[in-house]
Regions:
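Zn-dependent metallopeptidase/amidohydrolase metal-coordination segment
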Residues: 301-303, 377-430, 435
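Active-site-adjacent substrate-binding region
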Residues: 268-285, 292-294, 341, 351-399
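Midchain, well-structured core segments that form catalytic/ion-binding scaffolds
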Residues: 148-151, 157-170, 204-327, 331, ...
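N-terminal capping segment at the start of a domain
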Residues: 28-56, 161, 350, 410-411
């Protein structure tokens, strides 16, 4: 089916979701209807194409849908840039015209670390125990309460899941749907208090693009929030300092029978190098403010090996110590070999936005008030990752991160409670009212 036909189908038809028939009527919440449509549009970014923006042409598919919907909701300037940014502005409500404009930002793309095309969302009424989202090869795809204790608090909830063969895409299409549903509420009732709003949906967040092509001056907002967090109530204004380390190992191939004193096995050099990094500072052993070294991939032969690590820490000094240790490990191996066979290339990715956002405590206070007004207890947590808001904050647009309501991102067990989609839209409505 041609791409434009697919988009027309998604825009103008109802969607059968499992045993539940969802229409764009009052029988289902607006935010749910939008979310179910958006997740069916594949938007996976591609790290192999990170030198271009967007990294995948499919991100334009959702971008074009959103721009059209924004125009239908009265955002006359809604448009898609050549780099797949969706940008639009909503005029302030009466009496709030002199208030600073506020930005709301989410990202279009989904990660490529799990299957993301052909998402088939359905609603599971969760009664407790294992959450089974689908079956693959006759076996249930399930999440247990032992692995996710938060499930114990969700018994009786309706949860949107995938069919178990793909991720769901709540990261970050839940955020997209919640922002769009807020815009729809304002279009229906322009008297809802709000300042002028800047709306932006960005490409390639999952591969670290960081919204670097957003024209902040044209966007015209004094502050912004990304809607890209996890379970409802999360409020984040601290993130990792982040870098990528590419380590290359050069070996010397010799016939194994004649190898003594002559062969240098690049694969073994990698193993020696990796063993010099602290075992307990791997992601699977860390939490909270604890940083890590994460081996994302390695390829090796006797002659050549390349390993790619991401390095993370909230504390700038500890972050630098981690980078220094990588250099020291390479130097130690080279010294042992008596020649340079291990080289390190460090690429800085983003910094902890707390350096900027801590000077704007009102952004945190207002967000807390909005959560509490909706009966949600705010949970201020450090982000164990990054958001577009990290780079935007350093570019002059302070930008904390709000929750979407989703769980288990980047995997086939990803889900989001229907009630969280609705409640988070309520939180956004309360939030913008406090800036009016």
């Amino acid at each position: 089916m041609p791409r434009h036909t697919v988009l027309e189908f998604l825009l103008h038809t109802t969607t059968k979701i499992g045993a539940v028939f969802m229409e764009n009527t009052t029988t289902s919440p607006d935010v749910l209807e939008r979310f179910l449509r958006y997740v069916q549009i594949n938007t996976q970014s591609e790290d192999a194409n990170c030198d271009q923006v967007p990294s995948s042409a499919v991100q334009f598919d959702l971008a074009n849908v959103l721009a059209e919907e924004l125009r239908e909701l009265g955002a006359e300037d809604a448009h898609v840039t050549e780099h797949a940014y969706v940008c639009a502005h909503i005029p302030a409500s009466a009496g709030a015209e002199d208030k600073p404009a506020l930005g709301l930002i989410a990202h279009l793309d989904t990660t490529e670390v799990a299957p993301g095309a052909g998402v088939k969302p359905h609603i599971v009424h969760y009664e407790g125990g294992n959450l089974v989202c689908g079956t693959v090869d006759g076996k249930p795809v399930a999440m247990s309460t032992a692995k996710l204790p938060a499930l114990n608090d969700l018994a009786g909830e309706d949860l949107v899941c995938s069919d178990g063969t793909t991720l769901l895409g709540a990261d970050d299409k839940a955020g997209v749907a919640e922002i769009m549903s807020l815009v729809a509420r304002i279009a229906q009732d322009p008297s809802l208090p709000h300042p002028a709003l800047g709306i932006c949906f960005c490409p390639d967040e999952e591969i670290g693009h960081g919204a670097e092509l957003l024209d902040i001056d044209t966007f015209g907002c004094k502050y912004a929030y990304t809607v890209d967090g996890g379970p409802i109530g999360e409020l984040e204004w601290e993130c990792f300092n982040a870098a990528e380390a590419t380590v290359r190992f050069e070996g010397q191939s010799i016939h194994p029978g004649d190898a003594k004193g002559r062969m240098v096995n690049a694969g073994n050099l990698f193993c020696d190098f990796n063993a010099l990094l602290p075992y307990v500072q791997r992601p699977e052993y860390t939490e909270g403010y604890e940083g890590f070294y994460h081996l994302e991939g390695v390829s090796a032969t006797v002659d050549h090996a390349t390993a790619r690590y991401i390095v993370r820490d909230h504390d700038a000094a500890k972050f630098q110590q981690k980078l220094d240790l990588i250099d020291a490990a390479a130097s130690m191996l080279n010294q042992r070999l008596g020649e340079e066979r291990v080289t390190v290339e460090i690429k800085q990715q983003y910094r902890n936005m707390a350096e900027i956002v801590r000077d704007y405590p009102e952004l945190i206070d207002v967000a807390k008030e909005a959560y509490l007004a909706c009966g949600v207890e705010p949970q201020v947590l450090p982000i164990r990752g990054g958001t577009d808001g990290a780079q935007l904050s350093f570019r002059g647009l302070p930008c904390p991160n709000l929750s979407t309501g989703g769980y288990c991102y980047h995997g086939v067990n990803e889900f989001v409670p229907v009630s969280s989609l609705v409640k988070m839209t309520d939180v956004l409505q309360e939030l913008v009212a406090r800036f009016a």
